[in-house]
Amino acid sequence: MPTKTIYFSKARTALKYGLQALELNDQDIILVPDFVCDSIFQPIQQNSLNFSTYELEDDLSPKWSSLDLLITKKIKAIVMIHYFGQPQDVDKFIGFCKKHSIFLIEDNAHGHSGLINGRELGTFGDIGISSPRKFQGSGGVLYLNKDYKESILPALPNEEPRASSSGLKFLLNKIPKFKHLIKRAIKKRPKYEDPRAFREPSMDDFYLSKESAEEMVRINWADIRNLRRNKFDALQNIALNGGLKPIFSKVHNESNPWCFAAYAKSQEEAIQWFDWGWQNNVEVFSWPPLREEQINSNDKAFLRWQRIVCFSTDS
């Protein structure tokens, strides 16, 4: 289990200070999967580090056959992402890192409280991050599994607690048809087909507020995991009946899936699903916002992005 757990307002802040715990040198290189939200590169750049990307299979596992070829003396760490809350082959990543004497950075931003054999995702790497913000609106967790200098932990203010909207959300969820009518009356469908529409700007660093941390402890995460896995199964049936190809053949039995994700045959078909979701009160969206150079070069990750359709497992 981690030697230290620290609560920040966002996962990217947790990653920023987690990287400092690794005590890497300027311009050291981190291996990052090519299919990832562009916000992960903010803390890498803030720490004066470089990155190289590695390719993925259709199930978003690494192309292991080519990964060894990327190792150089400047490679000091690799990022392992549990996409959409589904666990990677953790043992294989750990073995790869031991073979090449590099650090394992575990990114569980999509699956907070998910487990493997009873152990929480995010706690296997030399450092790990998780994002309860995906589930409760705020919070980024840093897990440290190595000795670190206390100086890496800065004097930061706590995030101001947000006004709770859970009561209103509960009432609206009791009358979903009314909720859907309100949403469609005051909003237009987000432009999920726009690869630049959902980028997140750099933000100030905060620790998580005391109120949010206490709320996180009170939440019954086991119930949330069960509800989301059941929703995953229901969404998978919808997707299969609609001709989509699931990224994962089944949901992991201890996971906390942020969403169900599948491949459409084309971006045109993906857009049809975005429209269908908006019309039928089902949250269907795209992910991730990629780096600008990936969009401009029409690279493999961008072509993958054009076809991926995500269905929220939030109740």
Region locations from a protein language model:
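PLP-dependent aminotransferase class I/II
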Residues: 2, 6, 36, 79, ...
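Active-site-proximal region of nucleotide-activated glycan assembly enzymes
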Residues: 129-130, 136-163, 173
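Short, solvent-exposed loop/turn segments at secondary-structure junctions
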Residues: 13-14, 36-38, 59, 83-86, ...
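Conserved active-site segment immediately N-terminal to the catalytic lysine
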Residues: 106-142
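PLP-dependent aminotransferase-like
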Residues: 2-5, 13, 20-108, 112
